[in-house]
Amino acid sequence: MNKPITASTYVRCLSLGLIRKLSDFIDPQEGWKKLAVAIKKPSGDDRYNQFHIRRFEALLQIGKSPTCELLFDWGTTNCTVGDLVDILVQNEFFAPASLLLPDAVPKNVNTLPSKVTVVAVQQKPKPLCGKDRTSVISDENPEQNYVLPDSSSPENTSLEFSDTRFHSFSFFELKDVTNNFDERPISVGGNKMGEGGFGVVYKGYVNNRTVAVKKLAAMVDISTEELKQQFDQEIKVMAKCQHENLVELLGFSSDGDDLCLVYVYMPNGSLLDRLSCLDGTPPLSWNMRCKIAQGAANGLSYLHENHHIHRDIKSANILLDEDFTAKISDFGLARASEKFAQTVMTSRIVGTTAYMAPEALRGEITPKSDIYSFGVVLLEIITGLPAVDEHREPQLLLDIKEEIEDEEKTIEDYVDRKMNDIDSTSIETMYSVASQCLHEKKNKRPDIKKVQQLLEEMTGS
């Protein structure tokens, strides 16, 4: 017979079946991230940093459960069921906590998930440690929520955006202008430009104008309901925010098999691609990099002035037009906040882990998290290195800050040598700005206006 589970039972001694049951509760809506950031070392420091969380996240791509792998890993430290239940209760995971120690759950709470919306998902892999999962759409800050209309009813096919300046395309039109969403890369004569967590981008031609068509598609662990929310949010933000340094949305389609967004085409791709010299493009000069940094800061400043937090600032989301003018893109995760100076909490942790501020990993939504992410982008601009590389030491680019502060290296050791117009003084200045943006404590980071000022002083513009 199996021994009864007590608070002193080691997590590593739990049966695989029980761990699978726990993962069924914790995997949806990335609850495992909340669990991971709550786990501490005996010293009180975080056990898991951004890189660890990114690795757990990557397990979804091969059909594994992050919760299972997290518990397997943490279990090697001789943590107990009592330790686990404490964290579960603190984060209001009452149902899985009651599976382990029913008496540890407060008597006045319901251990069944409340306000659950079960939604269909497309192409969702089956986790190797758990059953097929449904997404739980949680009731976040009610002032922040925007209720989507029922897109299945004919009168709501425009998703209530008929009063915006955007053109409503038919799905058939977009299929036609993208050669039936030709999946072949542009380099071999197809239309596919790239893909991300929320869809695939295709090159198309509308009235002799080149456009970029993003067809939203449920990737790993993203439900169709979340996809609709991304679509809705992107249009809402774009309707309110127009600026030289924000990408321009031309229209959308919501009448077909997939939701689509149509943008002005950016011929020079993303900052990420140009820094890596993708497809043999020449390296960006230092002067050009400074211009791009200032443009991106201007775009972010406009968003913050208009009470929007982007939540996914990264080099892949900074696009470049024919003049290499920076255009911030991808507003599907953006949040509007009337109480902009205050921190808002969310049960849904989103963003790209290698760029995420410590508080963002805890579910806080604050403009200072955008500042932190922008600090990582500035390091990419200086070094030409990607934000994360598992074959590099340090693997996370933001960790070079520690090496420089410990005087093991200087920023000169990391400067991208592909540039032929290196200016040591302005590089030091940009690194100083990046370092301030990357302060662990959000209140110690500069606001975007200060960042703008420092970058302008750097170039004398």
UniProtKB/Swiss-Prot annotation:
Cofactor(s) named in the record: Mg(2+)
Subcellular location: Cytoplasm
Chain ranges of the Death domain: 20-104
Coiled-coil residue windows: none
Residues annotated as domain Protein kinase: 187-455
N6-acetyllysine modified-residue sites: K34
Record keyword Zinc present: no
Native organism taxonomy: Eukaryota, Metazoa, Chordata, Craniata, Vertebrata
Name of the featured protein: Interleukin-1 receptor-associated kinase 4
Entry's Gene Ontology BP terms: cytokine-mediated signaling pathway; innate immune response; interleukin-1-mediated signaling pathway; interleukin-33-mediated signaling pathway; intracellular signal transduction; lipopolysaccharide-mediated signaling pathway; neutrophil mediated immunity; neutrophil migration
Residues the record lists as N-acetylmethionine modifications: M1
PROSITE patterns associated with the record: PROTEIN_KINASE_DOM
Modified residues (Phosphoserine): S347
Major localization listed first in the record, in broad terms: cytoplasm
Reported modifications of this chain: Phosphorylated.
Source organism superkingdom: Eukaryota
Quaternary structure, from the entry: Associates with MYD88 and IRAK2 to form a ternary complex called the Myddosome. Once phosphorylated, IRAK4 dissociates from the receptor complex and then associates with the TNF receptor-associated factor 6 (TRAF6), IRAK1, and PELI1; this intermediate complex is required for subsequent NF-kappa-B activation. Direct binding of SMAD6 to PELI1 prevents complex formation and hence negatively regulates IL1R-TLR signaling and eventually NF-kappa-B-mediated gene expression. Interacts with IL1RL1. Interacts (when phosphorylated) with IRAK1. May interact (when phosphorylated) with IRAK3.
Keyword Transcription annotated: no
Modified residues (Phosphothreonine): T343, T346
UniProt function note: Serine/threonine-protein kinase that plays a critical role in initiating innate immune response against foreign pathogens. Involved in Toll-like receptor (TLR) and IL-1R signaling pathways. Is rapidly recruited by MYD88 to the receptor-signaling complex upon TLR activation to form the Myddosome together with IRAK2. Phosphorylates initially IRAK1, thus stimulating the kinase activity and intensive autophosphorylation of IRAK1. Phosphorylates E3 ubiquitin ligases Pellino proteins (PELI1, PELI2 and PELI3) to promote pellino-mediated polyubiquitination of IRAK1.
Keywords: Acetylation, ATP-binding, Cytoplasm, Immunity, Innate immunity, Kinase, Magnesium, Nucleotide-binding, Phosphoprotein, Serine/threonine-protein kinase, Transferase
Active site (record annotation): D312
Name of the encoding gene: IRAK4
GO molecular function, one term: interleukin-1 receptor binding
Binding positions for ATP per the UniProt entry: 193-201, 214, 314-317, 330
Reactions it catalyzes: L-seryl-[protein] + ATP = O-phospho-L-seryl-[protein] + ADP + H(+); L-threonyl-[protein] + ATP = O-phospho-L-threonyl-[protein] + ADP + H(+)
GO CC, one annotated term: nucleus
EC number: 2.7.11.1
